[in-house]
Amino acid sequence: MVSTTKSTGSVTQIIGPVLDIAFPNGQLPKVFNALKVQSSEGTITCEVQQLLGDNKVRAVSMSSTEGLQRGVEVIDTGSPISVPVGTDTLGRIFNVLGEPVDNLGPVDSESTLPIHRPAPAFTKLETKPNIFETGIKVVDLLAPYRRGGKIGLFGGAGVGKTVLIMELINNIAKAHGGVSVFGGVGERTREGNDLYMEMKESKVIDADNLKESKVALVYGQMNEPPGARMRVGLTALTMAEYFRDINKQDVLLFIDNIFRFVQAGSEVSALLGRMPSAVGYQPTLATEMGALQERITSTTEGSITSIQAVYVPADDLTDPVPATTFAHLDATTVLSRNLAAKGIYPAVDPLDSTSTMLQPGIVGTEHYSTAQEVKSTLQRYKELQDIIAILGLDELSEEDRQTVSRARKIERFLSQPFFVAEVFTGSPGKYVSLEDAIKGFQMILKGNLDDLPEQAFYLVGDIDEAIQKADSMKD
């Protein structure tokens, strides 16, 4: 029950983004309540983290505390930070407090929800694992996503993370009638702006009719205080939960970057008086991660499928953040610079990407055996590459030459033209059903297409298109 009377306190101590605030006896705010601090720079929103005793609370600020003084008035709002939800959020950019930051005026949304909410009850969860078809061959065949699952997206700069994300947003809207929420957690402001502009250009955001857009954006960027970066993931998740629970839709939630979410928590952890744990991270790392991840799930009415970019500090997979994140992931999509250099897009590494869904009991024997055969062919090709580089292709046995030929066709057939890249490439995008993808790879593996040139398989949709392309190349 939210209290209607608002108690007033005053700031007694300021240490960076952390404030100590004294309240009158018996009028202490609850943990996670939002507080409004009246400063000369305007109103600052804080969130209560600890009750210290002696009628004092410790809170973390969601915006900069520059210019703040001791003694200024603080008002307890009586409830947690609440953000607008619903279709009015589509096509807009919000900050951690749910305030629009795109200069397109206020949001008309009548509904708001608090950012701290319990995970769905166990009885409401969808227990049968279902494949979430993306229409992207390499993903659906070799590392399929689970509906309501969590996927880690690993890749350096410039290998196509953003384009892959935009294609997934586009495909979920077209194939599943779903929407997406993008949470920019502690990443570069410039990249956030570029993403917004590219989304407008590729019509993922419809500037003329915002409600027809397919995505809502929530940003808490690198230049913002840790409080904002620590909570912006929850703001994005809350908006996604509304689409799942009330609109009963399939939702894609992107978190870029999950590492920054933990990093922000570690920045304020010591200021809150907690003893640091391994590598200087907060002792509550696993709890904070679990509270976020457990809300991302599939219920009997809708689903939130989450794709999380994972920054791996110093490429050390044993670092507490990647290690804790891995425990929650159902699949990993690894982008490879070598494939990007060859011009094979999406540059998803077929051998490094994994999925817990790739089991015969879930995907069926046909899908599983095709995927395993594709992987073993590519693995054999990888082993033979050193021999080819030194001795040449002619020194290989007949069988190995055939394997290399098929592997090169498979490698090219794993590429695909994207809808969102049409603007840049001029070739129309293709959505390939899982059934068509399996059929195509089986034909290559069986040797039915050995006589076709490998270039015919490059940047096509299904196998019929590759055959047509080969025919046109003959002409």
UniProtKB/Swiss-Prot annotation:
Where does the chain cross the membrane?
none
Q: Which InterPro entries match?
A: AAA+_ATPase, ATP-synt_VA_C, ATP_synth_F1_bsu, ATPase_a/bsu_AS, ATPase_alpha/beta_chains, ATPase_F1/V1/A1_a/bsu_N, ATPase_F1/V1/A1_a/bsu_N_sf, ATPase_F1/V1/A1_a/bsu_nucl-bd
Choose one Gene Ontology CC annotation of this protein and give it: proton-transporting ATP synthase complex
**Which stretch is the leader sequence?**
none
- Gene3D superfamilies, per the entry: 2.40.10.170, Bovine Mitochondrial F1-atpase, Atp Synthase Beta Chain, Chain D, domain 3, P-loop containing nucleotide triphosphate hydrolases
Q: Where does ATP bind?
A: G155, G156, A157, G158, V159, G160, K161, T162
Protein EC: 7.1.2.2
In terms of superkingdom, the source organism counts as Eukaryota
Q: Which GO terms describe its biological process?
A: proton motive force-driven mitochondrial ATP synthesis
- Topology of this chain in the membrane: Peripheral membrane protein
GO molecular-function annotation terms?
A: ATP binding; ATP hydrolysis activity; proton-transporting ATP synthase activity, rotational mechanism
Keywords of this entry? ATP synthesis, ATP-binding, CF(1), Chloroplast, Hydrogen ion transport, Ion transport, Membrane, Nucleotide-binding, Plastid, Thylakoid, Translocase, Transport
Which family is this sequence assigned to? Belongs to the ATPase alpha/beta chains family.
HAMAP family with a match to the protein in the record: ATP_synth_beta_bact (MF_01347)
Give the protein's function: Produces ATP from ADP in the presence of a proton gradient across the membrane. The catalytic sites are hosted primarily by the beta subunits.
PANTHER family according to UniProt? ATP SYNTHASE, ATP SYNTHASE SUBUNIT BETA, MITOCHONDRIAL
Question: What's the protein called, per UniProt?
Answer: ATP synthase subunit beta, chloroplastic
The organism of origin for this protein: Pyropia yezoensis
Q: What is the lineage of its organism?
A: Eukaryota, Rhodophyta, Bangiophyceae, Bangiales, Bangiaceae
